[in-house]
């Protein structure tokens, strides 16, 4: 019997908060197979799967664990590898998404419980042929006032080059001390999110207006953490 844990999401872009949730899932379910499920859908948001995958790899997701799927909350591309009659399936989300669909524990019109059930309080865990389960893990602040990719997308076009570098080094610690790699990430984000000219002298209050403090008080100097060798050119070849 295997427990499969899937972290579904949009990941526009994948960032340090997502990585923290991924690691939280690994700690919460130490014997499970933990995956991240993402689509290639850019109809409403800007990041294609190939860029999401590069940023997830840079952040620290292991190879083979960031998987392209058609539907993140079905993730059949992942579950097809496992036995629906024996194995258990758990989806994990951040606490901040507790009120976002899909909601676990809904009673269907015919009076039967829905396929997706809350893990908390479950007396018996059924194989995923019958039910999947939802677990919520603590939300992690991954930058000054940042808890979501939406805040990154909102803040990014308002930041000057210095603050973009600072934010990238906060979101992706492996870029710290590697200016070329940081600039490659900035080019990816500029291409996906967009950019505008911002004066270097813009005040912090102007830069962070309506962005929940994104980039406020940040500098490009950080205590380096989790600095792993990364090919500085591996992000440079990409198509958007």
Where are these regions (language model features)?
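Short acidic (Asp/Glu) patches
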Residues: 209
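Nucleotidyltransferase catalytic core that binds NTPs
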Residues: 1-205, 213-225, 229-239
